[in-house]
Amino acid sequence: LTDAYLSLMKALQHAGYQAGRKIVISWIESDALEEGNELCDSEAWKKLKAADGLLVPGGFGERGSEGKMRAISYARTQRVPYLGICYGMQLAVIEYARNVLEEKQADSEEFEAGGAGPHFVVYMPEIDRGQLGGNMRLGGRTTYFRQDIPSLLSPFYQNAPSFSARHRHRYEVNPEYVERLEAAGLMFTGKDESGVRMEVLELREDVHPFFVGLQAHPEYTSRPNKPSPPFVGLIQAAIQHRQSLGTSASTAC
């Protein structure tokens, strides 16, 4: 795991250095959050409930997605700081659609089950569905913060109008459902140059202290002397979360 997620680990450590804290990473197998754990008394759930923040990284495929969404739901409802990267952003959208919009069949076109949907995450229009190799949206891309609504993430980028980060994906938030999601409180504060592709999602600060998703992979440009802004935000929120709880941990599930 340390090799597979090395960039994420380093980004967390860099943010910890800036905050003067040692970051302890607790790995959770998302499959263990799924079936048979309704009482939330498994070791995986104990780890999740003891965490000061939650990071769901990029990934592929349906395996483990239900467990990841249960973890995201926990973080959202219990106000635990959350950062979703790429797939972690897309799953946050589906979780919100299922549990807030009550679209219980909401899913992604990536899921092998191929259900009837509604598909809140879809193939990007420029992607050739018949060829999975060599057709991803790759490399550095610019994300533009919206100027008509406040953003929790923007101050960590010194309120710059935009930022650049590397991308690696072939799916995106379905633009057909953006208006509905925003009406229910899930705000898309960053978009690509077209204004159609969603790049950053957030819950308002009065609703949640730090609930952020990015389509990009900001961990790749994190450095010890210049930590990645979203990870700085996550760690700062996690510190505040721990301080607010004192020595007691959240026990809801």
Feature roles, as predicted:
Residues 1-210, 215-253:
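N-terminal beta1-alpha1 cap of cysteine-dependent amidohydrolase-like domains
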